[in-house]
Amino acid sequence: MVRGLRLKGSSVERVLRCNVLQSPLAGVSDKIFRALVRRWAPDALLFTEMVNATSLELGHGRGKVEELSEETGPIGVQLFDHRPEAMADAARRAEDAGAFLIDINMGCPVRKIARKGGGSGLIRDPDLACRIVESVASAVGVPVTVKTRLGW
């Protein structure tokens, strides 16, 4: 049961008031899907689909982040990339849009993402993974979490 779970960021503490969490699902957890989940679990922690920090920087993934302000309830934004600066910038944008927390994707095994050093590809470079976590955590006040896997 996660009811009342406290998540601390550098300047913001968040409290989950529901035992329902909807994980980020590429191609599934869009705004419409989240609205359906929210109908049955109003206080659930929902997530966006994973957002490529570089695409967001170039203006291609803005909709996934900017639409947060139109929604109610806690929504986490899952980011992936291999560049600490891009991840920090994307995290700031997500926080400004109202993200409840930022989740760093270090678990996606999709080849085109992992071979560029994103997703589970970060497991192969622990120093880079640490730099990304540090840059994101220092860029935002909301809690930062990491989705990972046990091995590659």
Question: Language-model segments: which ranges?
Answer:
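Glycine-rich, proline-tolerant flexible connector loops at the mouths of alpha/beta enzymes
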Residues: M50-E57, M106-P126
